[in-house]
């Protein structure tokens, strides 16, 4: 028998039982569920990662839906339990769902939700922040000051790289990659080289227009080029930001060989998925190339880092906070809750999961729809 876990209960007499495996930012998501007669149970266990057994205890004998997190293992065991309890939906509070066995969810008829369309800009902002912090060696300088080592100005103290006029490389020019590229091009007047299987016409038009604006005002125009291969980006870019999906073709996309292809003083940024980088190879490269710098928000074996990474002064490492702006995290919680609510109430699936603004306007009621169900087609309700 599963050991009971600590919970906080809202609207105890609600008709539908919805469980959240973690406390989530804001209260709008709770209120939206309560307004539709849901009893909301929030797990308050002091654990960063809940085990399968913990979640089984939360599901119990009757559960209409669960809001969960990327750190949880949602497979055969949990989906079968949720189905037996009468559950109709599970939603990650995340865009990604690598932690979810969608085939198992399909087998038991459980809808799987995610939260795209709300974290594009905030993720791109963090990638841009890491780029600037790495280029100007901000973290090293901060640690230097806090250690009381500053005796006065020196001409060679923490000399970094000027971004203006350099080339930013983007691998994966989807929504986040394109938003990052626009920030770096317009914010720092960098030239762009990008690689994507699909042409990013909108991004190209943006850079072209900005280049024409600069030229008209007597400045050197920025340029763009779509690379024919990822290796081309790695060889030519001064700052490289990774924004691919994670699948078999992108696992260890950056490895020992590709690291060698980069400039000795290049900057590598990853706010996408940890396993796209061979982290052990990266540690070796950082050790052997002290002018090479990296900014990481995600890790190959998260929450763990490969041995030696934390010791690298030329690495900036942050704990998966790309979406950690107040508006974004509250929006993610709202979308996840509405995914579950929509399936409980029998609502249709929203037509465009990347255009979710109508669900996020706090001044109006959200549409009667599930914002994003990744297996809607498989379940026959696309």
UniProtKB/Swiss-Prot annotation:
<dbReference type="InterPro" id="IPR006139">
    <property type="entry name" value="D-isomer_2_OHA_DH_cat_dom"/>
</dbReference>
<feature type="active site">
    <location>
        <position position="273"/>
    </location>
</feature>
<dbReference type="GO" id="GO:0051287">
    <property type="term" value="F:NAD binding"/>
</dbReference>
<dbReference type="GO" id="GO:0005777">
    <property type="term" value="C:peroxisome"/>
</dbReference>
<dbReference type="InterPro" id="IPR036291">
    <property type="entry name" value="NAD(P)-bd_dom_sf"/>
</dbReference>
<dbReference type="InterPro" id="IPR029752">
    <property type="entry name" value="D-isomer_DH_CS1"/>
</dbReference>
<dbReference type="Pfam" id="PF00389">
    <property type="entry name" value="2-Hacid_dh"/>
</dbReference>
<keyword id="KW-0520">NAD</keyword>
<comment type="similarity">
    <text>Belongs to the D-isomer specific 2-hydroxyacid dehydrogenase family.</text>
</comment>
<feature type="binding site">
    <location>
        <begin position="271"/>
        <end position="273"/>
    </location>
    <ligand>
        <name>NAD(+)</name>
    </ligand>
</feature>
<protein>
    <recommendedName>
        <fullName>Glycerate dehydrogenase</fullName>
        <ecNumber>1.1.1.29</ecNumber>
    </recommendedName>
</protein>
<dbReference type="InterPro" id="IPR006140">
    <property type="entry name" value="D-isomer_DH_NAD-bd"/>
</dbReference>
<feature type="active site" description="Proton donor">
    <location>
        <position position="320"/>
    </location>
</feature>
<comment type="pathway">
    <text>Photosynthesis; photorespiration; 3-phospho-D-glycerate from glycine: step 3/4.</text>
</comment>
<dbReference type="InterPro" id="IPR050223">
    <property type="entry name" value="D-isomer_2-hydroxyacid_DH"/>
</dbReference>
<feature type="active site">
    <location>
        <position position="302"/>
    </location>
</feature>
<keyword id="KW-0323">Glycolate pathway</keyword>
<feature type="binding site">
    <location>
        <begin position="320"/>
        <end position="323"/>
    </location>
    <ligand>
        <name>NAD(+)</name>
    </ligand>
</feature>
<keyword id="KW-0560">Oxidoreductase</keyword>
<feature type="binding site">
    <location>
        <begin position="175"/>
        <end position="176"/>
    </location>
    <ligand>
        <name>NAD(+)</name>
    </ligand>
</feature>
<keyword id="KW-0576">Peroxisome</keyword>
<feature type="binding site">
    <location>
        <position position="297"/>
    </location>
    <ligand>
        <name>NAD(+)</name>
    </ligand>
</feature>
<dbReference type="Pfam" id="PF02826">
    <property type="entry name" value="2-Hacid_dh_C"/>
</dbReference>
<dbReference type="GO" id="GO:0008465">
    <property type="term" value="F:hydroxypyruvate reductase (NADH) activity"/>
</dbReference>
<keyword id="KW-0601">Photorespiration</keyword>
<dbReference type="GO" id="GO:0009854">
    <property type="term" value="P:oxidative photosynthetic carbon pathway"/>
</dbReference>
<dbReference type="InterPro" id="IPR029753">
    <property type="entry name" value="D-isomer_DH_CS"/>
</dbReference>
